[in-house]
A protein has these predicted regions:
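Conserved NAD+-utilizing ADP-ribose enzyme module
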Residues: 1-91
């Protein structure tokens, strides 16, 4: 599994989007190529330089549950485009 983070700040949080209810949703990618592609789309939308890190599925999901954070796992079959910047954050 892979997360998108700010380059140089990998220990300070990963990319998340905010849903219509104000909940943060952590984006988790099954494939590294998909995470890299998403990071590139973010950078094209004037985000700072991004980095992709590998994480163990059970560790990141457990961290989400402990911190009461929602998450979404994207498969290679999913088409993912960044939402508007005001709907994003790093958690």
């Amino acid at each position: 599994m892979y997360l998108v983070t700010l380059d140089g700040k990998e220990n300070e949080g990963a990319y998340s989007a905010v849903d219509e209810f104000g909940n943060h949703i952590l984006y988790i990618f099954e494939e590294k190529d998909d995470a890299i592609r998403f990071a590139m789309l973010l950078e094209e939308d004037d985000y700072p330089k991004m980095n992709v890190i590998e994480v163990e599925e059970n560790v990141v999901i457990m961290a989400c549950k402990i911190n009461e954070c929602e998450y979404r796992i994207f498969t290679p079959n999913d088409i993912v485009v960044p939402p508007q910047q005001e709907d994003t954050n790093f958690i």
